[in-house]
Amino acid sequence: MMFRDQVGILASWFKGWNECEQTVALLSLLKRVTRTQARFLQLCLEHSLADCNDIHLLESEANSAAIVSQWQQESKEKVVSLLLSHLPLLQPGNTEAKSEYMRLLQKVLAYSIESNAFIEESRQLLSYALIHPATTLEDRNALALWLSHLEERLASGFRTRPEPSYHSRQGSDEWGGPAELAPGEAGPGWQDKPPRENGHVPFHPSSSVPPAINSIGSNANTGLPCQIHPSPLKRSMSLIPTSPQAPGEWPSPEELGARAAFTTPDHAPLSPQSSVASSGSEQTEEQGSSRNTFQEDGSGMKDVPSWLKSLRLHKYAALFSQMSYEEMMTLTEQHLESQNVTKGARHKIALSIQKLRERQSVLKSLEKDVLEGGNLWNALQELQQIIITPIKAYSVLQATPTAKDEGRGEPLLPGAEPPLTHPGSDKGTEAKDPPAAENYPPPPAPAPSDSSEPAPAPVADGDIPSQFTRVMGKVCTQLLVSRPDEENITSYLQLIEKCLTHEAFTETQKKRLLSWKQQVLKLLRTFPRKAALDMQSYRQQKGWAFGSNSLPIAGSVGMGVARRTQRQFPMPPRALPPGRMGLLSPSGIGGVSPRHALTSPSLGGQGRQNLWFANPGGSNSMPSQSRSSVQRTHSLPVHSSPQAILMFPPDCPVPGPDLEINPTLESLCLSMTEHALGDGTDKTSTI
């Protein structure tokens, strides 16, 4: 897309906003320019406004405290219009005029909250006041309190509709005017412009709001220098439904945080046009008193902002920040429609949530595909896409009753809190008797003869970390037995680093991933770069680049034929199909002795590529004295191929048919076979 096209799109959005939204958006953008750019823009603006006498006259009126104080004699509609047109022109340092503005603004806000009139105008006035350089920290704290109260009242069921004709507000805090407003005059646009359907500034502050107002501390109730304090509001008969609190009470921060997250008023649609937030990193939650699951440990929601940003849906972070992980996973288009999310956005969100539900089936397809020799680069790219999605630590309470009751003395302990919240307290229970699903894969059993442990159980539904770890084991096996690829190894190591810092993975899973990392790093050191041939000549075109930001749907990764045509490493034809070798059987080796599988003449030199049951796991994969050892054999002919060249260091000659197997290759084969021998008792098989 050309630059002029991008500018055109931005201009079309800009035209769809009202003047207040345009101002806030421009200020947000100006915060990102350099001082030179800012000065240049200032010169341009001063030059263009030099001959505008009208704006100079308007600015003079806006900074006259005497003129502003006389506005209280005007009608309510005119006062609101005057405030909107003059408040942006207030000069910083003019404390006298500012006090008059704040005093008048208090009355407008009090009237708007009680009578449900001028709601849109009140939003805009608050937005101007909160970002205005003339307001102080105390001013913004008090204004933020008004903002919270306005939002609280609206969330309780108010609607921005014209008031009934019989409504007439009378009270001690009524601000004067020669005539009451007619019903049709309740909310006209300012400067003779009709109100826009989505023309408002969101309640939550964006980055354009000074940081001081983003946290309402202990001085939240501090009055302004001009002694502005929220006045008690009298209950009006037109307020249906009414607010739960008493008419003269302000809601406490606890009450604000306890409100339901899904009672957003229908006048505040969460559309891109109505939001001035420009990135997921900006402040999207309500003022500090409300719930924010993005910051809760073990919530599984910490990665939601970055995930939404990758989908270009970061403007809806405020909606997700009020949800739990389970609520997010059950979102539907109907619910999003009730929150007034635009049609296109809610359809995209619903599709993205559906793909989150399909992650486990995608991972299972990936596991099968890697076993069948699929394109390793594509599998790594899919794993990269999955790891950036929101993933919650699996709780044992999510497992089936069979899994929960499987020989554990304390079935509720791991599920009482997120597994990684207090990892130190769980280490002992994991080492003694780990749950099969939660802590996959556990440490290997001490001896293969121990038949007291059950066979490796399938990963429980919803246990994304375990399923992800399982696929990572398959990929590690593939890396160990195939020609080394620097890009694949780098991508794999990046994935492991993300997993090691992710709260959803258990300590046992992280230890396993760390051992695989060490194994791959050892492999990288074993094969010097200069010993490898030109990798680009062997790597076929990687044409399956991720152009979209969403995950592939389930089933799209199981196309073995398409994958095998894009294989980036040479695979010799198999002497026996995988099914006959029993590599995909539940026991892992299908009844065929690993020793026989290694020494069988029928496999020949081609069978070596099919040893998918390697245990890439660190020290646990090394030969031990308690296990049967595999003797050296001469039944595997060695071919002088690029694969063979890469498998040996430069100082070790390539063996011929009559030589012993190189110790490096032998060590790898021993590691694979030792894992296969212990597969029945060690539930860490990567098959």
From Swiss-Prot:
Residues 160-172, 424-435 have a biased composition (Basic and acidic residues). The modification Phosphoserine is found at residues 172, 271, 278-279, 281, 548, 550, 556, 585, 593, 621. Residues 160-301, 402-464, 600-636 are annotated as: Disordered. Residues 215-224, 617-636 have a biased composition (Polar residues). Pfam families: SAM_1 (PF00536). The modification Asymmetric dimethylarginine is found at residue 595. Residues 299-372 form the SAM domain. GO terms for cellular component: cytoplasm; nucleus. One of its GO terms (biological process) is regulation of mRNA stability. It is found in: Cytoplasm; Nucleus. Keywords: Cytoplasm, Methylation, Nucleus, Phosphoprotein, Repressor, Transcription, Transcription regulation. Residues 175-190, 200-211, 278-290, 448-461 have a biased composition (Low complexity). CDD domains: SAM_Smaug. The modification Phosphothreonine is found at residue 400. Has transcriptional repressor activity. Overexpression inhibits the transcriptional activities of AP-1, p53/TP53 and CDKN1A. This is Protein Smaug homolog 2. It comes from Mus musculus (Mouse). The lineage of its organism: Eukaryota, Metazoa, Chordata, Craniata, Vertebrata. The gene is Samd4b.
